[in-house]
Amino acid sequence: MLIPRQQAPDLSVDTLGAGRFRLIDEKPERMTLVCFYRGLHCPICASYLKELERLTPAFAERGVATIAISSDDEARARAMADAQLGRADLVGHGLSLADAGKWGLYISASRGKTSIGIDEPALFSEPGLFLIRPDNTVYYLSVQSMPFVRPNFAEMVQALDFVIKNDYPARGEQLLEQPAA
């Protein structure tokens, strides 16, 4: 289980416009925002990624680099970027399900065509959002088991202002032992 202040798992995927993305090689001023999304078949992901793209300059002003990653293959990732985004360099693809599991992402099985008529892959990862510090430690994480109710990017930009101003530490670093059943 990932918890704040611990090392993030390895993450290396191809992008549509910027070559290979390797998290360990990223050296943003403050953090890298990693947005895992379900894929081309998800209409909620499309609007979510549009909002991320819109606010990417605001994140950059705060020293936060952004990338959106799915387990889609290159063709599906390109179709999503072409239909929904103005920048292909924001999109990574080919996340293995094993790597998705290392990030604590939930995996779902296909239920056929979605509400927008696109087939779901046989298996795919559900959404997750992470802020990773330049030393590759987890600062923030949120993982969803459904496509609904994701962290709000505009609120995150505002929260980053507070975090930066107050040098606010990563929280949630303690896990309690669970009693035996």
Identify the meaning behind each predicted range.
Residues 1-181:
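Chalcogenol-based redox active-site neighborhoods
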